[in-house]
Protein backbone atom coordinates (compact mmCIF):
# COMPACT_ATOMS: atom_id res chain seq x y z
CA UNK A 1 0.00 0.00 0.00
CA UNK A 2 1.49 3.40 -0.94
CA UNK A 3 2.20 5.89 1.81
CA UNK A 4 0.87 9.44 1.92
CA UNK A 5 4.20 10.82 0.78
CA UNK A 6 4.23 8.43 -2.17
CA UNK A 7 0.81 9.47 -3.38
CA UNK A 8 1.09 13.19 -2.69
CA UNK A 9 3.98 13.93 -5.05
CA UNK A 10 3.77 11.60 -8.06
CA UNK A 11 5.26 14.19 -10.42
CA UNK A 12 8.43 14.48 -8.32
CA UNK A 13 8.83 10.70 -8.26
CA UNK A 14 8.20 10.45 -12.01
CA UNK A 15 10.64 13.24 -12.81
CA UNK A 16 13.38 11.62 -10.73
CA UNK A 17 12.69 8.23 -12.28
CA UNK A 18 12.85 9.45 -15.87
CA UNK A 19 15.87 11.66 -15.22
CA UNK A 20 17.83 8.66 -13.95
CA UNK A 21 16.61 6.58 -16.89
CA UNK A 22 17.65 9.30 -19.33
CA UNK A 23 21.15 9.37 -17.86
CA UNK A 24 21.46 5.59 -18.27
CA UNK A 25 20.26 5.79 -21.88
CA UNK A 26 22.71 8.58 -22.66
CA UNK A 27 25.56 6.41 -21.41
CA UNK A 28 24.39 3.38 -23.39
CA UNK A 29 23.64 5.00 -26.73
CA UNK A 30 25.37 8.38 -26.92
CA UNK A 31 28.53 8.15 -24.80
CA UNK A 32 30.82 7.73 -27.82
CA UNK A 33 29.09 10.64 -29.59
CA UNK A 34 29.65 13.01 -26.69
CA UNK A 35 33.00 11.89 -25.29
CA UNK A 36 36.05 12.00 -27.58
CA UNK A 37 38.44 9.06 -27.79
CA UNK A 38 41.36 8.92 -25.38
CA UNK A 39 44.30 6.70 -24.57
CA UNK A 40 44.20 4.87 -27.90
CA UNK A 41 40.61 3.65 -27.40
CA UNK A 42 38.55 3.47 -30.59
CA UNK A 43 35.09 5.00 -30.93
CA UNK A 44 33.56 1.53 -30.56
CA UNK A 45 35.64 1.00 -27.42
CA UNK A 46 34.31 4.28 -25.99
CA UNK A 47 30.79 3.07 -26.80
CA UNK A 48 31.51 -0.20 -24.98
CA UNK A 49 32.56 1.74 -21.87
CA UNK A 50 29.34 3.77 -22.05
CA UNK A 51 27.22 0.63 -22.42
CA UNK A 52 28.93 -0.96 -19.43
CA UNK A 53 28.42 2.14 -17.25
CA UNK A 54 24.79 2.50 -18.36
CA UNK A 55 24.08 -1.18 -17.72
CA UNK A 56 25.57 -1.08 -14.22
CA UNK A 57 23.69 2.14 -13.42
CA UNK A 58 20.36 0.67 -14.53
CA UNK A 59 20.93 -2.33 -12.27
CA UNK A 60 22.09 -0.28 -9.29
CA UNK A 61 19.21 2.20 -9.68
CA UNK A 62 16.68 -0.68 -9.63
CA UNK A 63 15.37 -0.41 -13.17
CA UNK A 64 15.37 -4.20 -13.27
CA UNK A 65 17.72 -6.75 -14.77
CA UNK A 66 15.54 -7.64 -17.75
CA UNK A 67 15.03 -4.14 -19.23
CA UNK A 68 18.61 -3.13 -18.39
CA UNK A 69 20.18 -6.11 -20.13
CA UNK A 70 17.90 -5.98 -23.17
CA UNK A 71 18.71 -2.29 -23.65
CA UNK A 72 22.42 -3.04 -23.33
CA UNK A 73 22.26 -5.85 -25.89
CA UNK A 74 20.47 -3.55 -28.34
CA UNK A 75 23.06 -0.84 -27.70
CA UNK A 76 25.85 -3.30 -28.55
CA UNK A 77 24.25 -3.98 -31.93
CA UNK A 78 23.98 -0.22 -32.54
CA UNK A 79 27.78 0.07 -32.26
CA UNK A 80 28.17 -2.22 -35.26
CA UNK A 81 30.45 -4.58 -33.33
CA UNK A 82 27.83 -7.32 -33.79
CA UNK A 83 24.79 -7.49 -36.03
CA UNK A 84 21.41 -8.87 -34.98
CA UNK A 85 22.22 -12.44 -36.00
CA UNK A 86 25.65 -12.50 -34.38
CA UNK A 87 24.36 -11.09 -31.10
CA UNK A 88 21.97 -14.04 -30.77
CA UNK A 89 24.89 -16.46 -30.96
CA UNK A 90 26.85 -14.43 -28.42
CA UNK A 91 23.97 -14.07 -25.92
CA UNK A 92 21.03 -16.46 -25.93
CA UNK A 93 23.00 -18.93 -28.03
CA UNK A 94 26.05 -18.74 -25.79
CA UNK A 95 26.73 -22.10 -24.13
CA UNK A 96 27.22 -20.42 -20.74
CA UNK A 97 23.76 -18.84 -20.92
CA UNK A 98 22.07 -22.03 -22.10
CA UNK A 99 23.69 -24.16 -19.39
CA UNK A 100 22.50 -21.65 -16.78
CA UNK A 101 18.91 -22.24 -17.88
CA UNK A 102 19.08 -26.03 -17.74
CA UNK A 103 21.23 -26.38 -14.61
CA UNK A 104 19.03 -23.92 -12.74
CA UNK A 105 15.93 -25.82 -13.87
CA UNK A 106 17.12 -29.27 -12.83
CA UNK A 107 18.43 -28.01 -9.48
CA UNK A 108 15.01 -26.52 -8.84
CA UNK A 109 13.57 -30.03 -8.98
CA UNK A 110 15.04 -30.47 -5.48
CA UNK A 111 12.75 -27.68 -4.31
CA UNK A 112 9.69 -28.80 -6.28
CA UNK A 113 9.85 -32.37 -4.95
CA UNK A 114 10.95 -31.33 -1.44
CA UNK A 115 14.18 -33.34 -1.79
CA UNK A 116 16.37 -30.48 -0.60
CA UNK A 117 14.33 -30.00 2.56
CA UNK A 118 14.36 -33.74 3.22
CA UNK A 119 18.16 -33.91 2.99
CA UNK A 120 18.55 -31.01 5.42
CA UNK A 121 16.16 -32.60 7.93
CA UNK A 122 17.72 -36.03 7.50
CA UNK A 123 21.24 -34.79 8.25
CA UNK A 124 20.17 -32.89 11.36
CA UNK A 125 18.07 -35.74 12.76
CA UNK A 126 20.85 -38.37 12.79
CA UNK A 127 21.18 -40.03 16.20
CA UNK A 128 24.97 -39.98 15.90
CA UNK A 129 25.11 -36.19 16.30
CA UNK A 130 22.52 -35.83 19.07
CA UNK A 131 24.09 -35.12 22.46
CA UNK A 132 27.42 -34.11 20.87
CA UNK A 133 27.45 -30.30 20.91
CA UNK A 134 30.49 -29.67 18.69
CA UNK A 135 29.53 -32.30 16.12
CA UNK A 136 25.91 -31.15 16.03
CA UNK A 137 27.01 -27.54 15.61
CA UNK A 138 29.30 -28.44 12.70
CA UNK A 139 26.55 -30.44 10.95
CA UNK A 140 24.09 -27.58 11.51
CA UNK A 141 26.50 -25.13 9.88
CA UNK A 142 27.29 -27.54 7.04
CA UNK A 143 23.59 -28.01 6.35
CA UNK A 144 23.42 -24.21 6.17
CA UNK A 145 26.18 -24.32 3.56
CA UNK A 146 24.32 -26.98 1.55
CA UNK A 147 21.12 -24.94 1.63
CA UNK A 148 22.90 -22.12 -0.22
CA UNK A 149 23.21 -23.74 -3.66
CA UNK A 150 20.27 -26.16 -3.45
CA UNK A 151 17.52 -24.45 -1.42
CA UNK A 152 18.37 -20.76 -1.24
CA UNK A 153 16.32 -18.58 1.09
CA UNK A 154 13.87 -21.43 1.63
CA UNK A 155 16.68 -23.32 3.33
CA UNK A 156 17.36 -20.39 5.64
CA UNK A 157 13.72 -20.31 6.68
CA UNK A 158 13.91 -24.02 7.55
CA UNK A 159 17.14 -23.56 9.51
CA UNK A 160 15.79 -20.62 11.48
CA UNK A 161 12.69 -22.66 12.30
CA UNK A 162 14.98 -25.35 13.70
CA UNK A 163 16.87 -22.69 15.66
CA UNK A 164 13.58 -21.49 17.17
CA UNK A 165 12.93 -25.05 18.35
CA UNK A 166 16.45 -25.40 19.78
CA UNK A 167 16.37 -22.22 21.86
CA UNK A 168 12.82 -22.92 23.06
CA UNK A 169 13.69 -26.50 24.05
CA UNK A 170 16.98 -25.66 25.76
CA UNK A 171 15.83 -22.45 27.41
CA UNK A 172 18.11 -20.04 25.54
CA UNK A 173 16.87 -16.46 25.35
CA UNK A 174 16.33 -15.00 21.85
CA UNK A 175 19.00 -12.40 22.63
CA UNK A 176 21.50 -14.95 23.94
CA UNK A 177 24.95 -15.29 22.42
CA UNK A 178 24.17 -18.86 21.40
CA UNK A 179 21.07 -17.93 19.42
CA UNK A 180 22.48 -14.83 17.74
CA UNK A 181 25.94 -16.20 16.98
CA UNK A 182 24.55 -19.48 15.62
CA UNK A 183 22.24 -17.54 13.30
CA UNK A 184 25.18 -15.50 12.02
CA UNK A 185 26.97 -18.79 11.36
CA UNK A 186 24.02 -20.25 9.47
CA UNK A 187 23.57 -17.10 7.38
CA UNK A 188 27.26 -16.84 6.49
CA UNK A 189 27.61 -20.54 5.73
CA UNK A 190 24.57 -20.36 3.47
CA UNK A 191 25.96 -17.34 1.64
CA UNK A 192 29.30 -19.09 1.06
CA UNK A 193 27.35 -22.11 -0.17
CA UNK A 194 25.62 -20.07 -2.86
CA UNK A 195 29.03 -19.77 -4.54
CA UNK A 196 29.36 -23.57 -4.91
CA UNK A 197 27.73 -24.03 -8.33
CA UNK A 198 29.53 -21.80 -10.86
CA UNK A 199 26.90 -22.44 -13.52
CA UNK A 200 23.86 -21.26 -11.58
CA UNK A 201 22.26 -17.84 -11.06
CA UNK A 202 24.17 -14.84 -9.77
CA UNK A 203 27.22 -17.04 -9.21
CA UNK A 204 27.55 -17.63 -12.94
CA UNK A 205 27.05 -13.93 -13.71
CA UNK A 206 30.01 -12.98 -11.50
CA UNK A 207 32.06 -15.98 -12.63
CA UNK A 208 31.55 -15.02 -16.27
CA UNK A 209 32.75 -11.44 -15.65
CA UNK A 210 36.27 -12.89 -15.53
CA UNK A 211 35.94 -16.24 -17.32
CA UNK A 212 34.39 -14.57 -20.37
CA UNK A 213 37.44 -12.35 -20.82
CA UNK A 214 39.79 -15.28 -20.18
CA UNK A 215 38.04 -17.47 -22.73
CA UNK A 216 38.11 -14.64 -25.28
CA UNK A 217 41.89 -14.67 -24.80
CA UNK A 218 42.01 -18.44 -25.28
CA UNK A 219 42.31 -19.29 -21.57
CA UNK A 220 39.88 -21.92 -20.29
CA UNK A 221 38.47 -22.27 -16.78
CA UNK A 222 37.36 -25.49 -15.12
CA UNK A 223 34.09 -25.97 -13.24
CA UNK A 224 35.29 -29.16 -11.55
CA UNK A 225 38.31 -27.53 -9.90
CA UNK A 226 36.10 -24.63 -8.91
CA UNK A 227 33.56 -26.85 -7.12
CA UNK A 228 36.19 -28.97 -5.37
CA UNK A 229 37.91 -25.95 -3.84
CA UNK A 230 34.61 -24.19 -3.12
CA UNK A 231 33.58 -27.29 -1.17
CA UNK A 232 36.86 -27.17 0.78
CA UNK A 233 36.28 -23.51 1.62
CA UNK A 234 32.79 -24.38 2.86
CA UNK A 235 33.92 -27.26 5.08
CA UNK A 236 36.83 -25.30 6.54
CA UNK A 237 34.62 -22.30 7.16
CA UNK A 238 32.09 -24.41 9.08
CA UNK A 239 34.93 -25.84 11.18
CA UNK A 240 36.46 -22.40 11.66
CA UNK A 241 33.20 -20.76 12.69
CA UNK A 242 32.49 -23.58 15.13
CA UNK A 243 35.88 -22.94 16.76
CA UNK A 244 35.28 -19.17 16.75
CA UNK A 245 31.96 -19.70 18.46
CA UNK A 246 33.39 -22.02 21.08
CA UNK A 247 36.81 -20.57 21.86
CA UNK A 248 36.77 -16.90 20.72
CA UNK A 249 33.20 -15.83 21.44
CA UNK A 250 33.08 -18.39 24.29
CA UNK A 251 29.46 -19.26 23.63
CA UNK A 252 27.92 -21.76 26.02
CA UNK A 253 26.91 -24.78 23.92
CA UNK A 254 26.77 -27.29 26.79
CA UNK A 255 22.96 -27.42 26.68
CA UNK A 256 23.18 -29.10 23.27
CA UNK A 257 24.10 -32.30 25.12
CA UNK A 258 20.44 -32.75 26.03
CA UNK A 259 19.08 -31.82 22.60
CA UNK A 260 17.41 -34.32 20.28
CA UNK A 261 16.27 -32.56 17.11
CA UNK A 262 14.66 -35.75 15.85
CA UNK A 263 11.84 -35.13 18.34
CA UNK A 264 10.73 -31.98 16.49
CA UNK A 265 7.30 -32.30 14.92
CA UNK A 266 8.70 -31.53 11.47
CA UNK A 267 11.23 -34.35 11.91
CA UNK A 268 8.62 -37.01 12.67
CA UNK A 269 7.91 -39.75 10.13
CA UNK A 270 10.80 -38.53 8.00
CA UNK A 271 10.77 -40.67 4.88
CA UNK A 272 12.10 -39.95 1.45
CA UNK A 273 9.61 -40.32 -1.39
CA UNK A 274 10.43 -42.01 -4.71
CA UNK A 275 10.03 -38.64 -6.45
CA UNK A 276 12.60 -37.07 -4.13
CA UNK A 277 15.03 -39.94 -4.67
CA UNK A 278 14.75 -39.63 -8.44
CA UNK A 279 15.22 -35.85 -8.26
CA UNK A 280 18.37 -36.21 -6.15
CA UNK A 281 19.83 -38.82 -8.53
CA UNK A 282 19.30 -36.75 -11.67
CA UNK A 283 20.52 -33.52 -10.10
CA UNK A 284 23.66 -35.34 -8.95
CA UNK A 285 24.16 -36.82 -12.42
CA UNK A 286 23.89 -33.36 -13.98
CA UNK A 287 26.51 -31.91 -11.63
CA UNK A 288 28.82 -34.95 -11.77
CA UNK A 289 29.33 -34.49 -15.52
CA UNK A 290 31.97 -31.84 -14.83
CA UNK A 291 33.71 -33.82 -12.08
CA UNK A 292 33.90 -36.96 -14.23
CA UNK A 293 35.88 -35.00 -16.82
CA UNK A 294 38.78 -34.88 -14.35
CA UNK A 295 39.14 -38.65 -14.05
CA UNK A 296 38.58 -39.78 -17.64
CA UNK A 297 41.94 -40.60 -19.26
CA UNK A 298 42.93 -38.79 -22.44
CA UNK A 299 41.71 -40.49 -25.58
CA UNK A 300 38.87 -40.74 -28.05
CA UNK A 301 36.27 -41.43 -25.36
CA UNK A 302 37.19 -38.28 -23.45
CA UNK A 303 37.02 -36.25 -26.65
CA UNK A 304 33.55 -37.63 -27.32
CA UNK A 305 32.49 -37.06 -23.70
CA UNK A 306 33.70 -33.45 -23.74
CA UNK A 307 31.86 -32.82 -27.00
CA UNK A 308 28.53 -33.36 -25.24
CA UNK A 309 29.09 -30.23 -23.06
CA UNK A 310 27.54 -29.53 -19.69
CA UNK A 311 24.48 -27.71 -20.97
CA UNK A 312 23.43 -30.55 -23.29
CA UNK A 313 24.03 -33.17 -20.59
CA UNK A 314 21.92 -31.17 -18.12
CA UNK A 315 19.22 -30.79 -20.77
CA UNK A 316 19.22 -34.57 -21.29
CA UNK A 317 18.91 -35.19 -17.53
CA UNK A 318 16.00 -32.74 -17.39
CA UNK A 319 14.30 -34.42 -20.36
CA UNK A 320 14.56 -37.90 -18.84
CA UNK A 321 13.49 -36.63 -15.40
CA UNK A 322 10.44 -34.98 -16.97
CA UNK A 323 9.45 -38.21 -18.74
CA UNK A 324 9.57 -40.39 -15.62
CA UNK A 325 6.32 -41.16 -13.80
CA UNK A 326 5.47 -42.63 -10.41
CA UNK A 327 2.01 -44.03 -9.71
CA UNK A 328 0.83 -42.55 -12.98
CA UNK A 329 1.99 -39.02 -12.13
CA UNK A 330 5.03 -37.11 -13.46
CA UNK A 331 7.96 -36.93 -11.04
CA UNK A 332 8.33 -33.23 -11.85
CA UNK A 333 6.42 -30.60 -13.80
CA UNK A 334 8.91 -29.30 -16.40
CA UNK A 335 6.75 -26.30 -17.28
CA UNK A 336 6.75 -25.15 -13.65
CA UNK A 337 10.49 -25.80 -13.36
CA UNK A 338 11.26 -23.76 -16.47
CA UNK A 339 8.96 -21.04 -15.15
CA UNK A 340 11.26 -20.61 -12.12
CA UNK A 341 14.30 -19.75 -14.24
CA UNK A 342 15.78 -16.40 -13.16
CA UNK A 343 15.53 -14.73 -16.56
CA UNK A 344 16.91 -11.46 -15.25
CA UNK A 345 20.12 -13.14 -14.11
CA UNK A 346 20.25 -15.21 -17.31
CA UNK A 347 20.05 -12.12 -19.49
CA UNK A 348 22.58 -10.36 -17.24
CA UNK A 349 25.05 -13.16 -17.91
CA UNK A 350 24.39 -12.77 -21.64
CA UNK A 351 24.76 -8.99 -21.62
CA UNK A 352 27.89 -8.84 -19.48
CA UNK A 353 29.49 -11.62 -21.51
CA UNK A 354 29.06 -9.57 -24.68
CA UNK A 355 30.02 -6.22 -23.15
CA UNK A 356 32.94 -7.83 -21.31
CA UNK A 357 34.11 -9.33 -24.59
CA UNK A 358 34.09 -5.87 -26.16
CA UNK A 359 36.01 -4.33 -23.26
CA UNK A 360 38.69 -7.04 -23.43
CA UNK A 361 39.00 -6.98 -27.22
CA UNK A 362 42.53 -5.89 -28.16
CA UNK A 363 41.39 -4.03 -31.27
CA UNK A 364 39.12 -1.65 -29.32
CA UNK A 365 41.91 -0.43 -27.04
CA UNK A 366 40.00 -0.50 -23.74
CA UNK A 367 42.00 -3.37 -22.32
CA UNK A 368 45.31 -1.67 -23.13
CA UNK A 369 44.19 1.65 -21.67
CA UNK A 370 42.78 0.05 -18.52
CA UNK A 371 46.01 -1.84 -18.07
CA UNK A 372 48.04 1.37 -18.24
CA UNK A 373 45.76 3.10 -15.72
CA UNK A 374 45.67 0.27 -13.19
CA UNK A 375 49.22 -0.95 -13.68
CA UNK A 376 50.56 1.37 -10.94
CA UNK A 377 48.18 -0.45 -8.57
CA UNK A 378 48.30 -4.03 -9.83
CA UNK A 379 51.30 -4.02 -12.15
CA UNK A 380 53.99 -4.68 -9.56
CA UNK A 381 51.96 -7.04 -7.41
CA UNK A 382 52.81 -10.68 -6.97
CA UNK A 383 49.93 -12.98 -7.81
CA UNK A 384 49.08 -13.84 -4.15
CA UNK A 385 48.91 -10.14 -3.25
CA UNK A 386 46.78 -9.46 -6.34
CA UNK A 387 44.24 -12.09 -5.28
CA UNK A 388 44.29 -10.86 -1.67
CA UNK A 389 43.44 -7.32 -2.82
CA UNK A 390 40.55 -8.65 -4.93
CA UNK A 391 39.20 -10.71 -2.02
CA UNK A 392 39.42 -7.89 0.54
CA UNK A 393 37.98 -5.20 -1.74
CA UNK A 394 35.15 -7.42 -2.99
CA UNK A 395 34.23 -8.72 0.47
CA UNK A 396 34.16 -5.26 2.03
CA UNK A 397 32.24 -3.54 -0.78
CA UNK A 398 29.71 -6.34 -1.21
CA UNK A 399 28.58 -5.91 2.40
CA UNK A 400 27.44 -2.35 1.63
CA UNK A 401 26.51 -2.64 -2.03
CA UNK A 402 24.74 -5.11 -4.32
CA UNK A 403 26.83 -8.28 -4.51
CA UNK A 404 25.93 -8.79 -8.17
CA UNK A 405 26.96 -5.26 -9.16
CA UNK A 406 30.11 -5.51 -7.03
CA UNK A 407 31.18 -8.73 -8.71
CA UNK A 408 30.47 -7.49 -12.22
CA UNK A 409 32.32 -4.21 -11.74
CA UNK A 410 35.38 -5.71 -10.05
CA UNK A 411 35.48 -8.67 -12.43
CA UNK A 412 35.43 -6.43 -15.49
CA UNK A 413 38.09 -4.12 -13.99
CA UNK A 414 40.60 -6.85 -13.10
CA UNK A 415 39.97 -9.16 -16.07
CA UNK A 416 42.84 -7.71 -18.17
CA UNK A 417 45.29 -8.35 -15.33
CA UNK A 418 43.91 -11.86 -14.85
CA UNK A 419 44.69 -12.53 -18.50
CA UNK A 420 48.27 -11.35 -17.99
CA UNK A 421 48.81 -13.48 -14.87
CA UNK A 422 47.34 -16.55 -16.54
CA UNK A 423 49.30 -16.06 -19.76
CA UNK A 424 52.66 -15.18 -18.24
CA UNK A 425 52.70 -17.26 -15.05
CA UNK A 426 50.53 -20.19 -16.11
CA UNK A 427 48.01 -19.43 -13.36
CA UNK A 428 44.73 -21.34 -13.53
CA UNK A 429 42.10 -18.62 -13.97
CA UNK A 430 39.51 -20.82 -12.28
CA UNK A 431 40.88 -19.89 -8.88
CA UNK A 432 40.63 -16.15 -9.56
CA UNK A 433 36.97 -16.67 -10.49
CA UNK A 434 36.46 -18.68 -7.30
CA UNK A 435 38.04 -15.96 -5.17
CA UNK A 436 35.85 -13.21 -6.63
CA UNK A 437 32.60 -15.18 -6.55
CA UNK A 438 33.10 -16.42 -2.98
CA UNK A 439 33.99 -12.91 -1.80
CA UNK A 440 30.94 -11.34 -3.42
CA UNK A 441 28.60 -13.99 -2.01
CA UNK A 442 29.95 -13.47 1.51
CA UNK A 443 27.48 -10.63 2.12
CA UNK A 444 25.45 -10.25 5.30
CA UNK A 445 26.55 -7.25 7.43
CA UNK A 446 23.99 -4.74 6.11
CA UNK A 447 20.53 -4.84 4.57
CA UNK A 448 21.99 -3.67 1.25
CA UNK A 449 24.53 -6.51 1.08
CA UNK A 450 22.31 -9.00 -0.77
CA UNK A 451 18.74 -10.25 -1.03
CA UNK A 452 18.87 -12.77 1.88
CA UNK A 453 20.58 -10.33 4.31
CA UNK A 454 17.28 -8.91 5.67
CA UNK A 455 16.20 -12.44 6.66
CA UNK A 456 18.87 -12.32 9.36
CA UNK A 457 19.04 -8.62 10.20
CA UNK A 458 15.28 -8.10 10.49
CA UNK A 459 14.99 -10.73 13.25
CA UNK A 460 14.06 -9.18 16.59
CA UNK A 461 17.33 -9.90 18.48
CA UNK A 462 19.38 -8.16 15.77
CA UNK A 463 16.99 -5.22 15.62
CA UNK A 464 17.29 -4.76 19.39
CA UNK A 465 21.09 -5.16 19.30
CA UNK A 466 22.18 -3.50 16.03
CA UNK A 467 25.84 -3.56 17.03
CA UNK A 468 25.90 -7.33 17.51
CA UNK A 469 26.25 -8.07 13.81
CA UNK A 470 29.44 -5.98 13.77
CA UNK A 471 31.04 -7.32 16.93
CA UNK A 472 30.24 -10.95 16.05
CA UNK A 473 29.98 -10.67 12.26
CA UNK A 474 33.33 -9.09 11.42
CA UNK A 475 35.53 -11.91 12.84
CA UNK A 476 33.79 -14.51 10.61
CA UNK A 477 34.27 -12.08 7.72
CA UNK A 478 38.02 -12.05 8.39
CA UNK A 479 37.99 -15.86 8.66
CA UNK A 480 36.24 -16.07 5.29
CA UNK A 481 38.73 -13.69 3.65
CA UNK A 482 41.65 -15.79 4.91
CA UNK A 483 40.14 -19.07 3.68
CA UNK A 484 39.10 -17.71 0.29
CA UNK A 485 42.54 -16.22 -0.28
CA UNK A 486 44.51 -19.20 1.03
CA UNK A 487 42.68 -21.72 -1.14
Residue ranges of predicted features:
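Hydrophobic transmembrane alpha-helices of multi-pass small-molecule transporters
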Residues: 1-99, 225-372, 472-485
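Hydrophobic transmembrane alpha-helices that form the pore/transport pathway of multi-pass ion
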Residues: 124-217, 403-439, 462
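Membrane-interfacial loop-to-helix junctions in multi-pass transporters
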Residues: 43-47, 93-97, 125-139, 172-183, ...
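Hydrophobic, membrane-inserted alpha-helices
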Residues: 25-28, 50-56, 139-145, 186-189, ...
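Membrane-core helix-loop-helix motifs of multi-pass transport proteins
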Residues: 11-13, 165-258, 262-273, 428, ...
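Short amphipathic alpha-helical coupling elements at transmembrane boundaries
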Residues: 89-90, 118-128, 165-168, 336-339, ...
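C-terminal transmembrane helix pair
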Residues: 170-173, 226-234, 347-355, 359, ...
